[in-house]
A protein has these predicted regions:
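Exported/periplasmic ABC-transporter solute-binding proteins
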Residues: 2-78, 83-93, 100-112, 119-124, ...
Length: 285
């Protein structure tokens, strides 16, 4: 798919969300106009928009609920595959924060000057998802290639888990056989998990943390994917008009007793005392 068409599709996909965001923002502005003008100290209360990977949706919803309860601030979220979100940011020039499933998308965004400061959050690992009890006796990557196994995975050109899987297995010369054995490609990692949950697939590759909300599924780790991990980070969008509010949400998200605690509860790997230093876009680190 060529780049102009990809960007056009991303804009079309984002249009309903952007209209909702603008509507909500207008409503908030109208309410503020009826009251006294806010002081500079209230700038962090302005509503913000987060572009968030589908793999982080469950934990993000929990964190946002906590944030609204504590501060009463509005947070709009657009969920989707990481590449699609990046394309939407590039086309629309809107939003305040970008949280893809893998830090490599933030590197691409910084190269395009779409994000500035970036902050570490958590880590996920690629695993083989199966239905609880393992009815198909899937224990190895080779088992996923069997003729009686329906194997699905996320599109490597759209989703972080798909790109990570392809890159990892290509280095080992294993990608072609898995690609040929794939029954279907899905738009994002949660769609893969949903296929297993409803019984339309037997196995697939997902991030381990995604299965936190799928009690009927479990996962196995295989040596071929032992190095397939994704660092989850959040970046401030360069053209954000609400940087004070965006920074307040980042501080909440990355606090050990707030957002990071929720990430631990949802099965993500989070250091007990992670470094909270900002990786500036100009630092080159």
């Amino acid at each position: 798919m060529n780049r102009p068409l990809l960007l056009l599709l991303a804009l079309v996909a984002a249009l309903p969300f952007l209209l909702l965001q603008l509507s909500g923002t207008d409503d908030n502005a109208a309410r503020r106009a009826k009251s006294a003008a806010p002081s500079d100290d209230d700038s962090w209360r302005e509503p913000i928009t987060v572009y968030c990977a589908a793999s982080n949706q469950a934990v993000m919803e929990t964190i946002i609920a906590d944030y609204r309860h504590e501060f009463g601030s509005q947070v709009f979220v657009n969920y989707g595959p990481s590449q699609g979100l990046l394309a939407q940011i590039e086309v629309s020039h809107t939003g305040d924060l970008f949280l893809p499933a893998d830090a490599s998308y933030l590197e691409s965004a910084r190269d395009k000057q779409l994000v500035s400061d970036v902050f570490p959050v958590a880590r996920m690992k690629a695993v083989i998802a199966i239905r609880r009890g393992n009815p198909k006796a899937i224990r190895t990557l080779a088992d996923c290639l069997r003729g009686d196994v329906r194997f699905v995975q996320a599109n490597p050109d759209a989703a972080a888990i798909g790109r990570l899987t392809r890159a990892t297995l290509q280095r080992q010369g294993l990608w072609k056989s898995l690609d040929q054995a794939t029954t279907a490609y899905r738009g994002n990692v949660t769609e893969v998990a949903n296929d297993l949950a409803v019984g339309s697939a037997d196995t697939g590759i997902v991030y381990d943390a995604v299965l936190h909300d799928y009690p009927g599924l479990e996962f196995i780790e295989i040596p071929e994917l032992q190095d397939a991990t994704s660092d989850v980070e959040i970046g401030i969008i360069t053209e954000s008009k609400r940087k004070a509010s965006a920074m307040r949400f980042v501080e909440f998200l990355t606090a050990n007793d707030r957002g990071r605690q929720r990430y631990r509860e949802h099965g993500f790997e989070v250091p007990i005392d992670p470094t909270e230093e900002t990786r500036s876009g100009s630092s080159g680190e």
